[in-house]
């Protein structure tokens, strides 16, 4: 049986083994998937040992995505663009291919929710300029989204916008200068909801037709989504579906098929709300 793991620190609360257990049952692909705690500063050592002992693939979570980027032998375009790897496949020749499925997982969930529509150019506001944002920009730009990127430290947003401008239409703005208009989609990729804070953007950015998506998820509504609801937005979602979506695209890298994410999302949501 082929062996896969999720590597991180901490790792005990990772949902990945449960998600892949559900995917395995759904697809009929029999593979072993576990957790692997990696001591800080020892990613290369642990990863080398895992793959030398027969491991075929891995997911990588915080804080090792940049370590994985440097560790692998080859990179997909999306991994190269975002400078981080969350999925690894050992190829037949023994080399390691690094991918980043976070952004594609987001696209899959946004499409499931009808927050994005094929062929339509959407006006998208992305809040935050950290690693989470870096992982989602290329897939959004490939989907012809017109992106405004905002961040408390506007210089970080400007640097990121310049870096990704070769892939599509993207600009940076200070939060207080975000254009007073209703965006088609607002994505909170900042850490504000982790501390129950609200992103410092004008309330006028929200609207009845504005879809709002928080990369963070928890039982109940995040602070960002609650604030969006109070300001007229009714199409709301947290990032649980993105978590499942990025796992589904890891399966695609490993087995060339994408599992249906809906049943797994429903089960995880039920467990989360218990």
Curated annotation (Swiss-Prot):
One cellular component (GO) term of this entry: cytosol
InterPro entries hit by this protein: Aminoacid_DH-like_N_sf, NAD(P)-bd_dom_sf, SDH_C, Shikimate_DH, Shikimate_DH-bd_N, Shikimate_DH_fam, Shikm_DH/Glu-tRNA_Rdtase
Reaction(s) catalysed (UniProt annotation): shikimate + NADP(+) = 3-dehydroshikimate + NADPH + H(+)
Gene3D superfamilies: Leucine Dehydrogenase, chain A, domain 1, NAD(P)-binding Rossmann-like Domain
Binding-site positions, NADP(+): 128-132, 151-156, 215, 239
Chain residues that bind shikimate: 14-16, 61, 86, 102, 217
Record EC number: 1.1.1.25
Protein's job: Involved in the biosynthesis of the chorismate, which leads to the biosynthesis of aromatic amino acids. Catalyzes the reversible NADPH linked reduction of 3-dehydroshikimate (DHSA) to yield shikimate (SA).
Pathway noted in the entry: Metabolic intermediate biosynthesis; chorismate biosynthesis; chorismate from D-erythrose 4-phosphate and phosphoenolpyruvate: step 4/7
Name the UniProt record assigns to this protein: Shikimate dehydrogenase (NADP(+))
GO process annotations (BP): amino acid biosynthetic process; aromatic amino acid family biosynthetic process; chorismate biosynthetic process; shikimate metabolic process
Similarity-based family: Belongs to the shikimate dehydrogenase family.
Family annotation (Pfam families): SDH_C, Shikimate_DH, Shikimate_dh_N
Description of how the protein assembles with itself and partners: Homodimer.
Species this chain originates from: Proteus mirabilis (strain HI4320)
